[in-house]
Design a protein with these regions (language model features):
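Residue-level recognition of the GNAT/N-acetyltransferase active site
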Residues: 100, 133
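Conserved acyl-donor/pantetheine-binding loop and adjacent beta-alpha core of acyl/acetyltransferases
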Residues: 63-97, 104, 154-159
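Conserved catalytic-core motifs of GNAT/GCN5-like acyltransferases
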Residues: 69-71, 131, 141, 146-162
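A short beta-loop-alpha structural element at the N-terminal edge
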Residues: 7-21
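Conserved GNAT acetyl-CoA-binding A-motif
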Residues: 113, 120-132
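Hydrophobic adenine-recognition pocket in adenosine-nucleotide-binding enzymes
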Residues: 13, 97-99
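Active-site rim helix/loop that mediates acceptor-substrate recognition in acyltransferases
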Residues: 31-57, 63-84
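Conserved acetyl-CoA pyrophosphate-binding loop and the N-cap/start of the following alpha-helix
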Residues: 103-115
Length: 167
């Protein structure tokens, strides 16, 4: 099926999306890095409007999520404590950029990042912050994110680089 024939829908998350969001996360990240169903339950309850879900023919294939805060740097504590979300915060944090393996390299994650960037700008944020592994630095740079160096994060016991997009 050609992409033109596929019905693509981008929307925010509701609690009804909990199980499919957790399933996609489990398919995309190792257990040591993946958020749990319980963590997603808290995140969706606190900031479901800061989840961007992409459905292809009614199947969730990609999502981006993260809280908003006045803190300038993304910390490991943010992953674990959804209640730290500040709806009027200055920075949109991006915790995860997920696309199921069979749907990668079709631009889905990029569409969601562009939507998250547009929404953050429209909401008057200072910008967005994410952490990534070194191999993904050039990918995020294409969207205007600047590498700020090694993050203090020890999430999943790997080295993360903090990247920031300022408006």
């Amino acid at each position: 099926m050609m992409e033109a024939d596929k019905k693509l829908v981008i929307r925010n998350a509701t609690m009804e999306d909990l199980f499919v969001v957790a399933a996609v996360e489990a398919e995309c990240f190792p257990v040591s890095e993946a958020a749990t169903e319980a963590e997603f339950r808290e995140r969706i309850a606190c900031y479901g409007g800061h989840f961007w879900l992409l459905f292809e023919d009614e199947r969730l294939v990609s999502f981006v999520d993260g809280m908003v805060t006045d803190q300038e740097d993304l910390t490991d504590e943010m992953y674990e404590r959804a209640e730290l979300h500040q709806e009027a915060g200055e920075w949109q944090m991006i915790f995860g950029v997920n696309t199921i393996p069979s749907c990668r390299h079709q631009g889905y994650a990029g569409r969601l990042l562009q939507q998250a960037i547009a929404d953050a700008k429209e909401q008057g944020r200072k910008g967005l912050v994410l952490t990534c592994k070194d191999a993904l630095i050039p990918y995020y740079a294409k969207f205007g994110f600047v590498n700020e160096g090694v993050s203090e994060s020890v999430h999943g016991n790997v080295v993360w680089y903090q990247m920031r997009l300022r408006f």
